[in-house]
């Protein structure tokens, strides 16, 4: 086939053309020699013939090499034609992604739900429960996964009287008759202290899943509108046989799963709630399907809350210890927890000490009632655990000196209930009630204006108007009765707007 004008000549055609030219030159060199045979002698003719043979042998070797090259080129062109024909009939394959070895969003190693995520009512506190499986990010090739959650929340509060803690509803801070600010009238406050920053790290190890959790809000003791307050900073090793936790976390005496769904951060007065450094070991004693029996054990930092008298200051020789038993099923759970404490006072001048022991027991439980309804309940009783009770923590009521100079733990008890009703999956109401009482003996040297008993009640309506936003309103009522039987009541209406980035 002859190439058209301007068309490139294939390599095989060029080789054939070169072979033809060599053959022509060979014939041309032979013709003059034949005509010269008549005028030359026999010896000269033989010499010319020998020379011509050498030239023809050399040219034959060149032609063999060129033929070999021609065969190689033809084979290569044939292979290229087959590839081009296959490419024209096969759909194009998309180019591979430049980053495929370590995807940013983790799926295979991230916790994957084996069943639908549990229902969370709109009024549920943010950043408390185990985070949802979605939203983890892989940190390169380290094997670590990270989930970040930011919660921005604004609470608007209108009180009918002075509250000792304006950002929290604390019945023990309500003034009673005869105290300053009693019946002081309405006041308004805005707070963003329930805003949260939380980080959940996790990775797989030979011993199970290792989790490291960090969380803070802004209910610190510093000055300003947003004082920093760390809530969680702990590591936890989780496997089918046990969990081992170490760091800063809620006390093992607390059952956070029965905390009612209040918009107010403080919650019921009688709920046991305390943070601190600890080590916690929870072996699994028995399993039956999705249900299990565990034995939570913990050693926690002691924090004796006793009012200073003279040169005496509170201290503890031993750590706080807890021992519990928990039965948990997919729809309900019950927990029995016990607290053991060592409380002491020491004179800074002569080193004289007074010590007493403290013990408390608590029974808690929650259950799913209907598809969107749940109920919670708790009861605690003991001596020397006032620092674990929401309403009287920090008031120095763990223990007190008697009139004869003996240190004794103060008895306290509290109970409460909560109920959440889901009108729809995005609209819910929660109600709760709590009662708390302390019973110091008559000869104890404590301030008689401190609370003897308090009551708490709440009712709210919360609307999850988008996947990441909630709007709610809550009514709160509280009563404070002092050791002198003076009474005071307070009411609050709170509205809450919350944005939760990655629950």
Which stretches of residues belong to each language-model region?
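Detector for outer-membrane/organellar transmembrane beta-barrel domains
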Residues: 327-451
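N-terminal periplasmic/intermembrane-space "pro-region" immediately following the signal or transit peptide
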Residues: 2, 35-165
